[in-house]
Each structure stands twice: as structure tokens, then as C-alpha cells.
Amino acid sequence: AVPGVRRYARSKGVDLTCITGSGNHGKITREDIDAYLANAAPTPTQPTAPAPTSEENTTPAAESTPQPATSSSGQRREKMSAIRKAAARALTEVVTTVPVVTILDRVEVSALVAHRNRLKDTAATREAKLTYTPYIVKACVAMLKKNPLMNGRVDMAAGEFIYYDTFNIGVATNTDRGLFVPIIKDADRKSLFDIAREITELSSHAKAGTLTSADMSGGSMTVTNVGGFATSGVWSTPIINAPEAAILGIGRFEDEFLPDKKGKPVLRPVCKLSFAFDHRLIDGVDAQKALNDLKEFLHNPDLLLAES
């Protein structure tokens, strides 16, 4: 690891000998350290069962619920799990060091809904669960291809912008153990059904606690769905998954009256979008242009599949 990475590891209390590097010639990167912390085993002082932190693909014992310390003052204390501690550190670092700007927008998606409805039964025969997320992953790839300045990160220590030639899209996955972001690697080379199958597989690993550091490192940007729950959201202000430079929040689909070609109001499904980006790398006008491209791809899935 380079000196800056070693200093970063020391500041996080991480032993570099426990990490397998994903950089050139096996070098350890900041992303490797962040991924290791996100999937770290609980410390011995915590009342939790051990989980693997190496590249082993074994199923860990279930993490037990921390026992609260009772108090007569109307308060209670609970130990944070190692995962929660790592997430808290990472999120705090982002909000205190990265100037994040969020753009809120919407897109009409009737063609996308119809396209998925036509394909979902066929997808099932090919062992693919076709939700809207694979479309959104491909739309992010197509957007990054048209806007290559979006596909990068900031290295403040070196005073450099680093741009990627790969298109790796993270998909935020909620589990009982916390939030994980497995990465769809080389998403530009995969079909809609391939991405659907991989999302299902990575989600299963996240819920089982068997994701590796390699599964969660090297992302170009992240997609997070706040509209897929019983109490689904509309817009949000998502925090970027550093060192990535952008994250796309997907809200619920809602029917709204929109004018047709003759100006007559017609009920159409509309998806809410929350696009957050690192303003050090991306200017506002470029971010809006990229978001407009993404909206076009979601509005026209035939164009999306032709471009990506």
C-alpha cells in the first residue's frame, strides 16, 4: 500500500495484513479498507457471533441482538455492532469532507413499465427476477458512457481526479445486519437478465453475511431504492458511497396526470429521482445533463437497451 493508504488504515485501526488488495499488482486501496470495515467481524467485547472477514465464502453464525443496558433515568444504551460502527465512521467522513449536492427530478415511465411487464414471465423461465433495478443499473451505465466525467473519483492527497474505464454499479441492499452495497462488475458487458440474476445472488450473500471485500469495492456509482418498501419514499438526499462520486436514489412510482400530444391530461406512472454527486468532481450543469440523459433512457427502454 502507498503511504497515504497506510495512514488511512492506521486512522481506522485496520491491520493491512488482513486485507487482500484489489489494485494493480495486489496493492491495497482505500476502497479495500472501506469494504473491509463494512464487512468487518464484531470485536470480541461485543455480544455478537463471529463473522468471516476474509475471502472465505462461508455462512457466519447469526449476529445476536446487543443487550441494552437499563437505566433509571429513562434512557438505555446498546453496543453498536462492528458493522454499524464502520458505517457510522464512513458516513461521518463523507458528510464532513465531501461537498455533496442533490438534484431532485422525475421521469415518466409508462414505456418502462410496459417493457418489464412484457419480459418478466420470460425472465422467470431463465431464472431471472426482473424488477426495475436491472433497468436502472443499465441506465446508469448508459449515462456514464455519455458523460465520462461522472465515472471517477477525487484523490485529494495527490491532487488528482481519477477516471474509470470500467462500469461497476453498486446496488444498496438492506439486511438485518445493516446496509451493504455489493457491486455489479462490468455491468456494460451484461444483459438485462444477467444483471437481474446477479442482483438476486449478491442480495442473498448480503443477507447471509457472506459478501467479500471484492464484492463491495471498485464501484463507479451506487443505486439505492427508497421506493420499494411498504412505507416507500418519494425523494431523498442519499449520501454517496465514498470514494464513488455519485448515487442515484429511486423513489416510488406514482400515477400523475400529464398532458398528451394534444394537451389532454392522461394518467401516467412517474418515477421520482434523487441524484447526489461530489461537487469537487462534477459541476452542477454537467450533473443535470447526465441526469437528463438517464431520464431519457428510463423513459425509452428500447433506446436504453440499444445504447447499453
Residue spans for each PLM region:
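C-terminal catalytic/motor cores of large multi-domain enzyme assemblies
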Residues: G4, Y8, K12-D15, K27, ...
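Catalytic-site-adjacent helices and loops of nucleotide signaling machinery
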Residues: G21-S22
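ABC ATPase nucleotide-binding domain signature region
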Residues: A1
